[in-house]
A protein has these predicted regions:
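Alpha-helical transmembrane segments
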Residues: 46-62, 168-174
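Membrane-interfacial segments at transmembrane helix termini in multi-pass membrane proteins
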Residues: 170-230
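Mobile "lid/hinge" segments at catalytic clefts and subdomain interfaces of large enzymes
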Residues: 133, 147-191
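Structured cytosolic domains appended to multi-pass membrane proteins
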Residues: 211-294
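Cytoplasmic-side transmembrane-helix entry/capping segments in multi-pass membrane proteins
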Residues: 5-18, 81-93, 138-147
Length: 294
């Protein structure tokens, strides 16, 4: 019952649950390592402790980051970038503190350090997402997808679960590759995405014209009539098609053009819509042939 336009929020919610599950498993393993064959409290195997710490940290970052992404997409929180002076140095300091805390935790196996590591990880997940604008959320969703995969893989090592390791690694690597491709399509830096270093606002929402203007209604045949003299047409669908649920009307227009021997194809930008593959799914709903999409 979730509309396609609300799918990014749903995906962000699922990512948050994956991250939270990784955190809970790490907590259970740290408090009761004997149940997972990791040793005894205060005497956990070093390798398992490193895996546990990394899985818990990445899981916490995924959880808090996904919650912020959900709030931004849902409109509960402003979709505009939220920045403040010294934000990047603070993020760098927190990331360094996570590394230091992980080292100290492996050395002392202190419960207080473990809780502090989780708290700091939750904080950095919040801080790296708030400066990203709503127009860039497709990249954020893909990046959080990657984070959730690595969190699952880290916990898979802790639990010695091969299936979880393989699945998490596949999700993590595919999400990272997709994020890189999307960043190239947007002319943005992949490193800045990881560090939460960019935040283009959605100009269409920030500069809305309040003036009321007349609306000209038309159907698929009217649109096709305007292009009747063309020999080839390339359609570039966007988020407006998703909001209006116009993919079926678009297909009707294309069918009319084809009857007039006009070649039609679809060009989809890597970050069109509000999540990766958004436009592809909508066109598939309208039974658009896949070989016409590029």
């Amino acid at each position: 019952k979730i509309p396609m336009t609300a799918m990014p929020e749903l995906v962000a919610g699922f990512h948050s649950l994956v991250g939270l599950a990784a955190v809970f498993v790490a907590i259970a393993a740290f408090l009761n390592p004997g149940a997972f064959n990791l040793g005894s409290p205060g005497n956990i195997k070093l390798g398992s402790l490193i895996e546990m710490s990394i899985g818990a940290a990445v899981g916490a970052i995924t959880f808090s980051g996904s919650i912020i992404a959900f709030l931004k997409l849902q409109g509960i929180m402003s979709g505009s970038p939220i920045t403040f002076k010294g934000q990047h140095p603070l993020n760098a300091l927190i990331l360094i503190s996570i590394i230091v805390l992980t080292y100290l935790l492996c050395s002392t196996q202190s419960l207080n350090l473990f809780w502090f590591l989780l708290a700091v990880s939750f904080l950095i997940g919040f801080l790296i997402i708030i400066p990203i604008g709503g127009a860039d959320m497709p990249v954020v969703i893909s990046m959080l997808n990657s984070y959730s995969g690595w969190a699952a893989a880290g916990i898979g090592f802790t639990l010695e679960n091969t299936a979880l390791i393989i699945t998490g690694a596949l999700v993590g690597s595919s999400g990272a590759i997709l994020s890189y491709i999307m960043c190239k399509g947007m002319n943005r830096s992949f490193i800045n995405v990881i560090l939460g270093g960019f935040g283009a606002t959605d100009q269409s929402s920030n500069s809305q014209n309040k003036e009321q203007k007349p609306v000209k209604n038309g159907n698929a045949e009217d649109a096709a009539f305007l292009m009747k003299n063309a020999s080839s047409v390339i359609i570039v669908p966007g988020y407006g098609m998703a909001v209006a649920q116009a993919q079926h009307a678009l297909r009707e227009m294309v069918d009319t053009l084809k009857k007039n021997n006009i070649k039609v194809s679809y060009a989809i930008h890597p970050v069109a819509g509000r999540m990766p593959g958004h436009m592809n799914v909508l066109l598939a709903e309208a039974n658009v042939p896949y070989d016409e999409v590029f």
